Regions:
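Non-transmembrane, aqueous-exposed alpha-helical and coiled segments at domain scale
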Residues: 1-418
Length: 418
C-alpha cells in the first residue's frame, strides 16, 4: 500500500490536477481533503480538457473511487453541474462524499461578494464563491453538514438556527443585502440540487480503511499551494483552509494517515492569482502570460507572472514535507532569453518575512542559460537540451529534494519521469 499526497509548493495553479490525473491510473482512490469551488484543477486527457473544481482529478479512472472529504466545503448545485459535465464526456463517476463535509450555500457566496464590495481597494481578491463564510460558519458551529441532506427535519432546523444568527448581522453590515428565502425553501432547494449525488453521502473513513486493509494506493489531492495556507501562507491573502500535506489525513477522513510520498508541485516559473506579493514579478508579463496560458481556472483572471522564486518554493517544499518535486510547464520557458532564478531576497526581515514586510523585499537573481529548441516531444530527461537539464538540476540543488517529474506539455505522455 502507498499513500501519495499531491500538494502545491507555491500559491496554487501549479498543475496539481494533471499530476493527480497521471498518477490516478494506478490508484484505487483519489481524495480531495480541503477547499471547495474556489480553485480549479485543469486536466487534459483523451476525453478532452476539464476544469475541475470540487471533483478529485482521479475521477477519470473508472476503477478509482473519487472521495470528497470532511475537510471540504461543498457547493451542492455546482457539484451536480460538474458531475453532469464529466458524465456527458463519457465518465462514470464512482464517488463517496463525506457526511461531515460542510455545505457552501448561495447565501455564503452572496455574503462573500458583499464583503469584497465593502472592502473596496482593501479586498482580499476572493473568488466570491462563499468559501470563507462557509468555513467561518463551521468554526462558529453554525455550518450545515452534508450529512443533514439525508435528515430533512434536522436540515430545516439547522438552517433556521444558522439564519436566525446570520441574517441580522448581514442586514446590519450590508445596506443592500436582500434575502427572502425561508429555511424550508432553502432545504427544498438543497434536496433538489443534491439529488444526483445524495446517495453517495457516507462516512468516507469506512471505504478508505477498507482500501488500506487491501494494500491499495490512495491518492490525496490538495487545492492551492503552501503560500495560500491559512496558517503558513501570506496572511491575510490566504485561503480559508489548511493546504499543507499534514492536513491530508484530517481532511480526508483518515486522521492517522502517514503518507509514504508527498509530491510538491511547482511550476518552472512563478505565477499567482489574487491579492498578495509576487516578489519576482516580471516587468513585461502579457506576452509570457498568453504563451503559458496563465489565467485562473475558476475566475479567468490573468495571473501575475514572475521568475522562479527558489526562496518561496523551498519554503513551500519544506512546509509540505515533500519527498519529491514535480516541475511543470518547463516547455513554456523555451525561447525565454531573460531566464533567471531568484536565489535570495534583499531587505529587512528577508529570512522569515510576513506581510507587509514581503512587499519591501527585492529579489536576488542568478542568471541561467536559455534554450530555443521545442521540448514538447522529449520523453526522457536526457533528450532535453543541456541548458534545460541544467535549469532543472539547479532547481533541484536549491530545493534539496529530488525533481522526479518534469512536465513538457499538458498531455499524460508529456510527463518525464526521472
Amino acid at each position: 500500500m502507498s499513500s501519495i499526497v499531491v500538494v502545491g509548493a507555491n500559491w496554487g495553479d501549479e498543475g496539481k490536477g494533471r499530476i493527480v490525473d497521471f498518477l490516478a491510473e494506478q490508484a484505487s482512490a483519489s481524495i480531495r481533503f480541503q477547499g471547495g469551488n474556489n480553485a480549479g484543477h485543469t486536466v487534459v486527457n483523451d476525453l478532452g480538457t476539464f476544469k475541475l473544481h470540487q471533483l478529485p482529478s482521479g475521477v477519470f479512472n473508472p476503477d478509482c473511487l473519487a472521495v470528497l472529504g470532511p475537510g471540504m466545503v461543498i457547493s451542492p448545485a455546482l457539484l451536480s453541474q460538474e458531475i453532469a459535465e464529466v458524465e456527458e464526456a463519457g465518465v462514470k463517476v464512482n464517488m463517496c462524499i463525506s457526511d461531515r463535509a460542510t455545505l457552501c450555500l448561495p447565501l455564503h457566496a452572496l455574503e462573500d461578494m458583499l464583503e469584497e464590495q465593502r472592502l473596496g481597494d482593501k479586498a482580499y481578491g476572493s473568488t466570491r464563491q462563499g468559501i470563507a463564510p462557509a468555513y467561518g460558519d463551521r468554526v462558529m458551529k453554525k455550518g450545515i453538514l452534508v450529512g443533514w441532506l439525508k435528515q430533512p427535519e434536522v436540515l430545516v432546523e439547522r438552517l433556521q438556527f444558522m439564519m436566525d444568527w446570520k441574517l441580522p448581522q448581514l442586514r446590519a453590515l450590508y445596506p443592500t443585502f436582500e434575502f427572502e428565502q425561508t429555511a424550508e425553501e432553502m432545504a427544498n432547494w438543497l434536496l433538489e440540487v443534491s439529488a444526483p449525488w445524495r446517495d453517495s453521502i457516507c462516512n468516507v473513513t469506512l471505504p478508505l480503511k477498507e482500501l488500506q486493509a487491501k494494500d491499495k494506493t490512495l491518492l490525496f489531492e490538495a487545492q492551492l499551494g503552501a503560500g495560500r495556507d491559512l496558517v503558513y501562507g501570506e496572511y491575510p491573502w490566504t485561503t480559508s483552509s489548511n493546504v499543507v500535506s499534514m492536513y491530508a489525513g484530517i481532511g480526508s477522513g483518515l486522521p492517522a494517515l502517514r503518507p509514504e510520498r508527498v509530491i510538491a508541485v511547482a511550476k518552472a516559473f512563478s505565477s499567482s492569482v489574487g491579492t498578495g506579493t509576487l516578489i519576482t514579478a516580471m516587468e513585461e508579463q502579457d506576452a509570457f502570460r498568453e504563451l503559458a496560458g496563465e489565467f485562473g481556472a475558476t475566475t479567468g483572471r490573468p495571473r501575475d507572472m514572475g521568475y522562479f522564486d527558489a526562496v518561496a518554493t523551498k519554503n513551500g517544499v519544506e512546509l509540505q514535507a515533500a519527498t519529491e518535486i514535480a516541475l511543470t510547464k518547463v516547455d513554456c520557458l523555451t525561447g525565454l532569453n531573460d531566464l533567471k532564478i531568484c536565489v535570495g531576497y534583499e531587505g529587512d526581515h528577508s529570512e522569515n518575512p510576513i506581510w507587509p514586510q514581503t512587499a519591501a523585499l527585492a529579489p536576488i537573481y542568478e542568471k541561467m542559460e536559455s534554450w530555443s529548441e521545442d521540448i514538447t516531444g522529449c520523453r526522457k530527461f536526457e533528450e532535453l537540451p543541456v541548458t534545460a537539464q541544467k535549469y532543472v538540476l539547479r532547481i533541484e540543488e536549491l530545493m534539496g529534494v529530488p525533481v522526479k517529474m518534469v512536465s513538457v506539455g499538458p498531455g499524460r505522455e508529456q510527463m518525464i519521469m526521472r
